[in-house]
Amino acid sequence: MSNTSGKIFSITSFGSSHGKAIGAVIDGCPANLELSEEDIQKELNRRKPGTNEITSPRKESDKVQIISGIFNGKTDGTPITGIVFNKDQKSHDYESIKNTPRPGHGDYTWKTKYGNYDYHGGGRGSGRVTIGHVIAGAIAKKLLNSYGIKVISHVTQIGKIKAKTVNMNFIEDYASQNPVRCGDPNAAIAMEDLILEYKEKGDSVGGIVETIALGVPAGLGEPVFGKLDGDLAKALMEIGSVKGVEIGFGFDVATSRASEINDEFYFKNKDKDSEKFENRENRDKYKKNKDKLNKKEDTNQDEHIKNKYLSNYDIGTTTNTSGGILGGISNGMPIVTRIAVKPTPSISTMQNTVDLEKGEETKIKIKGRHDPCICPRITVVSESAVAIVLADHMLRSGFIHPSDITKH
């Protein structure tokens, strides 16, 4: 079983849904990063259950304890261990599924592979193990923030309800204030109503979560087998319930022409009035001014001056269909990822399954406390996965000193 991810900045997670505790050990974080339990707690609070009607009613404080890696309020370069003790387990709810695998869950595959499988609340396969992701992600985000990198996320779709494209301020301000974590106020209301409708029916619904990383420098990523987008896709797919990943335009590139989606370059400091276009809607706005932009002449510039642009000027792209990554390497534009999250498989509707002990087909109606939609709580997990990968690549590419952040 693989429980560790990352080359330099790495996470080893441990624990299970109904075990004594869940947590993570983080290796590779340089010394002298100011870090407190509160830094991690505020992220865990975004993930914890029982906060509103559209989350699991399981009541957990998810209070984190840092038991190593911090000295005098700063990281000391040694492994950081964060642990959360489980408080509100109801393991008896799961005795009925001991030998009857739940449709949509990993019960059957885990039992087939390992034999000795903790079926209580999904055990190690539960979404609750993402507590470890969030602990590590909180540290990664604190590290990235000190280098001007911000990672944010929001829900863009629940069921068939899609949010309108909103600016970054709405995502940062409004998405954090509503239970659905959506930046479009009107869509957020409709999404919440839809989730409650499915909850009333004993069913669940899926959706899409978008995560954006701002301020990432050009140069992260190690082709051929260490591509930044490859590592991001892997990290995001390793989150439970995620069944698909897109970067930039994603699957829409399959129906596009290169002339439509190639991200054209420009010198940001040379033409300060040019905008960075980060989404599909703004691309059309750019095309209206494209000819005018292309006709600008580099007069009175000799070859020496032109070459200086490569080091003295920031280079941007007029669109961002690539999602901030070209050839497996970051290009300095915002990194944009989206994950498709399946409906929570634990539902109270009657379903067909098999009894592995009796060797016969049977019916199952799942008990327990479950989310009618996991998307709102998975936003912070997606942020964490992206932040962990970026922190690792920042260290691998030399943007962060590996032992002491004050030395860079």
Task: Indicate residue ranges for each PLM-predicted region.
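Short acidic, glycine/tyrosine-flanked loop/strand segments centered on an H-E-D-like triad
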Residues: 97-123, 352-370
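Glycine-rich anion/phosphate-binding loop at the beta-strand->alpha-helix junction
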Residues: 13-20, 202-205, 209-279, 292-361
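Glycine-rich, mobile lid/loop segments that gate access to catalytic sites or pores
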Residues: 112-224
